[in-house]
Amino acid sequence: MKIAFLGPAPPFRGGISNFAMHLADEFSKQKHQIMLFNFRNQYPGLLFPSGNQYDSSSTDLPSVRMLTPYLPHSWSKTLKAIQDWQPDLLIASWWLPFFALSYGYILKRVTCKVVILAHNIIPHEEWLGTRTLLSYAFKSAHKIVVLSRSCLLDLKRTLPNNISRRGVLGFHPIYKPLQLQRYEAQAFPGLLFFGLIKDYKGLDVLLKAMPIIRLAIPDIRLRIVGSVYGSSRIYENMIQELELKANVECHFRYVPDVEVANFFAISDVCILPYKTATQSGVIATALSYETPIIASDVGGLGEYIDHEHTGLLVPPDNPPALAAAVIRFYNEKMMEPMREAIASQKDSNTWAELARLIIE
């Protein structure tokens, strides 16, 4: 089968690009013919205040950089290129209404089967006309694969039945990690907050929880690893005001894949204090490194965490509850049992299973 992908791929950085690359690699292993119809430009600088949109990642799969979603003249060029390649299936990565006009234009004109791979249905930030934009982009899809029950529910709530009934529940597979060398003898207990930092991810909630945690675990250390969408000043000010400089280590930058293992190797638990969510690639990354997770019980996060076995779930936007979970994690010595539980479950939810669900 000839399978085309529409959306970001390397050298664009981030979870959407990474997900598409892993899925395309899986289809390639299954002897399908692959073509990545990549973005030439993804966002105007105004919509991407966290710096460079690229990293050093690459792929050996065939890829052409053509589409700029906010430049209409690129839409017809991308459409023609897809049609000339004559795919049997087009998989479009979706996560923001920003792409609705360009995707809608292309998807309703291609002659092959269309699958939308939806990482989100309702965006974390408010967008004017979300329902209309979703309807326009999604109406040409033969199948809409979502990655959590929360997203499937959003799809049914937001779009008319003639579109939403095409929704299919998928999942976020666990990544195959780079080699990880655990450092068993830690100088201090280590928490990790990982990934692109936006307000909805609740880093402020975690920082407010830290003084409570420190009372019970004086040598606790939190590593914050990820670029900030906007300015890091708000978090730097909180760290100073809460007198957390001795307990918080900040790496406000994008971390390429080759460095990711280093941070998980020296962390006991990954914290996701999200205020809202659908699903999270950070969970898949943490599980790939057999790192337990403490996360807010919002959206689809709980679908990927087995409470009290692979992690702990807490109410959102609640620093005392988050602090209590962290303290319990250490007091009850949960780290090793949770790592073992994660290791026993890693063979489920594979890329091969997701690929089968998409093409069946």
Report residues per predicted region.
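N-terminal strand-loop element at the rim of the active site
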Residues: 7-13, 24-84, 151, 166, ...
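A conserved mid-protein helix/loop that constitutes part of the nucleotide-sugar donor-binding site
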Residues: 17-22, 198-212, 284, 320
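Donor nucleotide-sugar binding/catalytic pocket of nucleotide-sugar-dependent glycosyltransferases
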Residues: 139-179
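Conserved donor-binding/catalytic core segment of Leloir-type glycosyltransferases
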Residues: 184-201, 207-210, 223-225
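A short, well-ordered alpha-helix in the C-terminal region of glycosyltransferases
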Residues: 219, 334-348
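Nucleotide-activated donor-binding/catalytic signature segment of Leloir-type glycosyltransferases, i.e.
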Residues: 235-258
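Acidic donor-binding loop of glycosyltransferase active sites
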Residues: 262-278, 291
